UniProtKB/Swiss-Prot annotation:
Residues 190-279 are annotated as: Disordered. It is linked to Meis1 serves as a site of viral integration in 15% of the tumors arising in BXH-2 mice that develop myeloid leukemia as a result of the expression of an ecotropic murine leukemia virus. Acts as a transcriptional regulator of PAX6. Also acts as a transcriptional activator of PF4 in complex with PBX1 or PBX2. Required for hematopoiesis, megakaryocyte lineage development and vascular patterning. May function as a cofactor for HOXA7 and HOXA9 in the induction of myeloid leukemias. This is Homeobox protein Meis1. One of its GO terms (molecular function) is sequence-specific DNA binding. Residues 203-213 have a biased composition (Polar residues). Expressed at high levels in the lung with lower levels detected in the heart and brain. Expressed in pancreatic islets (beta-cells and non-beta-cells). Residues 190-202 have a biased composition (Basic and acidic residues). Residues 335-390 are annotated as: Required for transcriptional activation. Keywords: Activator, Developmental protein, DNA-binding, Homeobox, Nucleus, Proto-oncogene, Transcription. Disruption phenotype: Mice die between embryonic days 11.5 and 14.5, showing internal hemorrhage, liver hypoplasia and anemia. It is found in: Nucleus. GO terms for cellular component: nucleoplasm; nucleus; transcription regulator complex.
Amino acid sequence: MAQRYDDLPHYGGMDGVGIPSTMYGDPHAARSMQPVHHLNHGPPLHSHQYPHTAHTNAMAPSMGSSVNDALKRDKDAIYGHPLFPLLALIFEKCELATCTPREPGVAGGDVCSSESFNEDIAVFAKQIRAEKPLFSSNPELDNLMIQAIQVLRFHLLELEKVHELCDNFCHRYISCLKGKMPIDLVIDDREGGSKSDSEDVTRSANLTDQPSWNRDHDDTASTRSGGTPGPSSGGHTSHSGDNSSEQGDGLDNSVASPSTGDDDDPDKDKKRHKKRGIFPKVATNIMRAWLFQHLTHPYPSEEQKKQLAQDTGLTILQVNNWFINARRRIVQPMIDQSNRAVSQGTPYNPDGQPMGGFVMDGQQHMGIRAPGPMSGMGMNMGMEGQWHYM
């Protein structure tokens, strides 16, 4: 071990550790010689950075050999001190505390803790007393060794405190994440949204199988509201009546059906709404109104989402999901219907919309009217009950 520390550069001299030169005689007396100044101003060149080199060059060879002998005696005195093994032990513990990954479950992980050093001190004291005394005949060297051990001991304690603070921070951060993130709410909301999506797709597919009496009723309603007759041979025309057919979020509502006794049961209606995770009608009306007012760009900004969440009483995530579904189930079918009307020869205006445009009957519904040769055909997107947003 003495050879190991002899190779380290910071053991090259004893000037930095505070041992006075009178401790081992006065071998450094030659250092009192002043270096030769080549300049008449400024500090001596390299007088502080390299003191040994500057003085050695100014000394006779015999003086240089005496300095080397003194340094060797100082090293031997430190390496041969009874407390040096304990000093080397705590130095290695400090190294382990900074470079070894700490795993609480692994055996021997506390080898660099301060408690383990207390045990090492007890074992070392018991062993050294049986062989030789703890201190040497030089009290100044004894004091130096004790102070060095104390400094490294404080350093080990500070490292242990840093590890404790890191562990405490990680534990509190993980607990905060587990407590603050509404994971179950997010999962429930997504599950409710997926169930609602599947049911909506089924009902949308059933819209094409409407009975003939409902088709005639739709044509009559569109004739009264829009003033343009729609023959029964054409597609379905959306109507403004039948507000009772709207349920919850209203993204894909089924057509009006004859009421039964089950529909009059409020408890059953509440259970059905709760099962599907449907939003309140007031909330969906507000969001639907915003959607129709911004059909050219139905993408609310973050600030608008926050405002809509405050107005509807929903969360920003729910508002965002509603608009994602609305763009897919309301806006996209309208665009597809417009494209089909254009492909069938409907006159097209410079704004990119059919000449009939999107006609809003009393702000209750939105239908597509095709003038000219197709004025007798009412276009319906099969979205009855979706336009009642007021």
